[in-house]
Amino acid sequence: GLKEWAMKKMCPIAVRLAKKCDGTLATKIKEICDNL
């Protein structure tokens, strides 16, 4: 669906932003994204 597509598009950006401030958060986000 559209939501899943949008999430997949946003994931790399979210991971990049999270990496700048919090590495563990980035890892969590990446795991969630990989499971989409």
Swiss-Prot record:
InterPro entries, per this entry?
Ectatomin_sf
Signal peptide feature range: none
Family per record: Belongs to the ectatomin family. Ectatomin-Et subfamily.
Alphabetically list the UniProt keywords: Disulfide bond, Membrane, Secreted, Target cell membrane, Target membrane, Toxin
Cysteine-cysteine disulfides: 11-33
Q: Which GO terms describe its molecular function?
A: monoatomic ion channel activity; toxin activity
- Specify whether Secreted is a keyword of the entry: yes
Q: Which GO terms describe its cellular component?
A: extracellular region; membrane; other organism cell membrane
Q: Does the keyword Amino-acid biosynthesis apply?
A: no
UniProt note on tissues of expression: Expressed by the venom gland.
User: Its domain of life?
Assistant: Eukaryota
- Compartments in which it is found: Secreted; Target cell membrane
Assembly and binders: Heterodimer of subunits A and B; disulfide-linked.
Primary site of residence? secreted
| Protein name (Swiss-Prot/TrEMBL) | U1-ectatotoxin-Et1b subunit B
